[in-house]
From Swiss-Prot:
Origin species: Homo sapiens
Bias kind Pro residues: ranges: 229-240
Lineage, top ranks: Eukaryota, Metazoa, Chordata, Craniata, Vertebrata
GO biological process assignments: actin cytoskeleton organization
Tagged with keyword Transit peptide: no
Name of the protein this chain belongs to: Phosphatase and actin regulator 3
Tissue expression from the record: Abundantly expressed in brain. Also found in several tumors such as lung carcinomas, nervous tumors and HL-60 leukemia cells. Isoform 3 is the major form in U-937, GOTO and HL-60 leukemia cells.
Length: 559
């Protein structure tokens, strides 16, 4: 009895037979789990079934793999997941390292970096001229050159010390630079003289080399601070080079400078290198990508070709200016280089001056109005200004002002004649042209046919008012005669011509009802439908008997 009670109380478990295919799959699954495979691969294996089934339940059928299961074997997406996880881990670890090595705001302020950047931003916004002021390096006097050469001798301890100095020391010199900028500036005459002097080809090449590499020993801080002048208010016009070689070298150097100034973000400025080649590291310098350099070269070439083609056209048009055009052709490359230098110094006023020199004939496109300065601060780059004019993104005030300036600067008739746009003619030439036109017109008019000829051809008909009135009277008489001859209705009935529809069709009297709308009294109720169905069934019962094979198709079956 105890055994029976135990048996009734708990479910008896029985083992599966060895012939059951699901046992094989279960054993393989357990073996793979014991082998210690990756968790990613374990996701793909089917879930292990229980080894013992409850008694009284049928064994489930063999599970069939779907067609999509074979795709998992071929493509193995869990391996892709594994690779993705590894990549994510690498990136996260790299980011954590960077964040750990990142300097705080307080440290940057201590070093003097952050304060300087804020002051730069303030100077940009507060500049009254429009463009951001460019810090120009003044070529030092011969005395300072000798001093620097003595200091930078390889044997001296100062030079060795500066060689070993890391990047942190030049970064800390930014604070000294700010102090130097706050110092009282020199007189306006001295500033103009200092600004007008520009570094020669050797100095420019040295400046490029100094900006690219930090190998050259930096100067002592006291001297660099002393030699940095206060920035001049206006950018200075670049002087023309003397020989072809100097032209080429300066052109290349300024091209690279311009491209770097354009490509660099406003927050990141490049190194300012003095003529001796020692870089004063103001902020971090981002290296220029080669694609940008190529773009700048292409742009410079395009401007050169445009100038050449324009001046070639001018020389064809006006024979008086051929000698001037030849000279301008030779100096076209020089002009291109000057323009690039102007971009590198970010001088808005200088751009306007050079544009006025180069495009005297293109007066309409010049912006001379001083009221436009405030609105066009954002559009100091010519290309950006042109794009904004074409796309219509300029503010409305700017558009109006530009239109007014263009209309004001429209060239006169004499100027157009001088430039061979409007043909130059004397009074005699004009008279001859008029006579030729008159001759052509008179010849055409003489070829027109006369009135008699048109009447003869029956094209033109001469009419009087009397004849027209007579024609109208005749038409009225004809119409009234026809109307009088019409028979009356009675005559037509007598002749049985006009017969009514009701004469030969039986017409039953019926109530008139509104056929237009779907009204509730027009709709059939349930009782109406039942009556119709009953009537139909009665009609069907009186008709011919339905065949036995098609009785299921009919609604009515005779009892």
């Amino acid at each position: 009895m105890a055994a029976s009670e135990d048996g009734s109380g708990c479910l008896v478990s029985r083992g599966r037979s060895q012939s059951d295919p699901s046992v094989l799959t279960d054993s393989s699954a357990t073996s793979s789990a014991d082998a210690g495979e990756n968790p990613d691969e374990m996701d793909q294996t089917p879930p292990a079934r229980p080894e013992y089934l409850v008694s009284g339940i049928r064994t489930p059928p063999v599970r069939r793999n779907s067609k999509l299961a074979t795709l998992g074997r071929i493509f193995k997406p869990w391996k892709w997941r594994k690779k993705k996880n590894e990549k994510l881990k690498q990136t996260t670890s790299a980011l954590e390292k960077k964040m750990a090595g990142r300097q705080g705001r307080e440290e940057l302020i201590k070093k003097g970096l952050l304060e300087m950047m804020e002051q730069d931003a303030e100077s940009k916004t507060c500049n009254p001229d429009g463009g951001p002021r460019s810090v120009q390096s003044e070529p030092p006097t011969p005395k300072s050159e000798t001093l620097t050469s003595e200091d930078a001798q390889p044997g001296s301890p100062l030079a060795t010390g500066t060689d070993q100095v890391s990047l942190d020391k030049p970064l800390s010199s930014a604070a000294h630079l700010d102090d130097a900028a706050k110092m009282p500036s020199a007189s306006s005459g001295e500033e103009a003289d200092a600004g007008s002097l520009l570094p020669t080809t050797n100095e420019l090449s040295q400046a490029l080399a100094g900006a690219d590499s930090l190998d050259s020993p930096p100067r002592p801080l006291e001297r660099s601070v002393g030699q940095l002048p206060s920035p001049p208010l206006l950018p200075t016009p670049p002087p023309k080079a003397s020989s072809k070689t100097t032209k080429n070298v300066t052109g290349q150097a300024t091209l690279f400078q311009a491209s770097s100034m354009k490509s660099a973000d406003p927050s990141l400025r490049g190194q300012l290198s003095t003529p001796t080649g020692s870089p004063h590291l103001t902020t971090v310098h981002r290296p220029l990508p080669p694609s940008r350099v190529i773009e700048e070269l292409h742009r410079a070439l395009a401007t050169k070709h445009r100038q050449d083609s324009f001046q070639g056209r001018e020389s064809k048009g006006s024979p008086k200016k051929r000698l001037d055009v030849r000279l301008s052709r030779t100096s076209s490359v020089e002009r291109g280089k000057e323009r690039e230098e102007a971009w590198s110094f970010d001088g808005a006023l200088e751009n306007k001056r050079t544009a006025a020199k180069e495009s005297e004939e293109n007066k309409e496109n010049l912006i001379i109005n001083s009221e436009l300065k405030d609105d066009l601060l954002l559009y100091q780059d010519e290309e950006a200004l042109n794009d904004s004019i074409i796309s219509g993104t300029l503010p409305r005030k700017c558009k109006k002002e530009l239109l007014a300036v263009k209309l004001r600067n429209r060239p006169s008739k004499q100027e157009l004649e001088d430039r061979n746009i409007f043909p130059r003619r004397t009074d005699e030439e004009r008279q001859e042209i008029r006579q030729q036109i008159e001759m052509k017109l008179s010849k055409r008019l003489s070829q027109r046919p006369a009135v008699e000829e048109l009447e003869r051809r029956n094209i033109l008909k001469q009419r009087n008012d009397q004849t027209e009135q007579e024609e109208r009277r005749e038409i009225k008489q004809r119409l009234t005669r026809k109307l009088n001859q019409r028979p009356t209705v009675d005559e037509l009935r007598d002749r049985k011509i006009l017969i009514r529809f009701s004469d030969y069709v039986e017409v039953a009297k019926a109530q008139d009802y509104d056929r237009r709308a779907d009204k509730p009294w027009t709709r059939l109720s349930a009782a109406d439908k039942a009556a119709i169905r009953k009537e139909l069934n009665e009609y069907k019962s009186n008709e011919m008997e339905v065949h036995a094979s098609s009785k299921h198709l009919t609604r009515f079956h005779r009892p």
